[in-house]
Amino acid sequence: MTDDDIEIRRLAREDAVLYRDIRLEALQANPEAFGSTFDVEDAQPLSLFSDRLGSSTVLGAFRDTELVGIVGFAVQQGQKEAHKGALWGMYVRPAARNAKVGRRLVEAVCNHARQQVELIQLSVVVDNEQARSLYARLGFLDYGVERNALKQAGRYYDLVLMAKDLSRH
């Protein structure tokens, strides 16, 4: 798989089955990396995933017709925080991780976000060096650590809080 084989586009309601499949895969493969759980989302009807795609910005990376990566974006609510957005739900299938899919997804979501916000924030599990390194290479800076932010199977996970000033890049 090469960089040229990948198409990045916004997912639509019609992509709900593909989105549900990759989202559940992400939650099962890396349960420590997400606030939600496989069991909770697996029990949801397909309409929940379709509605999420209709009301949220979720970008997908496609190799032909296969969805190989996803990332979400949301503008913060509230008048005083409307200049900020959040990158969420990032996942790239293992077979696509060396094809710059993650990089292309983050670049695409930043380009999309730049039209709406000045600052994009994210959180990532401290131990996820590969993701942290990717975000840092793309201009995200650490601004804090949330201790014991997630608890999975009796273990606590700290989150590194990162942000990128889109008005400067």
Identify what each model region corresponds to:
Residues 121-125, 136, 141-157:
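Conserved catalytic-core motifs of GNAT/GCN5-like acyltransferases
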Residues 10-95, 106-108, 112, 165-169:
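Acetyl-CoA-dependent GNAT
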Residues 80, 89, 93-107, 125-133, ...:
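Conserved glycine-rich acetyl-CoA-binding loop
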Residues 113-123:
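Conserved GNAT acetyl-CoA-binding A-motif
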Residues 66-69, 130, 156:
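Glycine-rich acetyl-CoA-binding "A-motif" of GNAT/NAT acetyltransferases
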Residues 2-5, 13, 158-169:
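Terminal substrate-recognition subdomain of acyl/acetyltransferases
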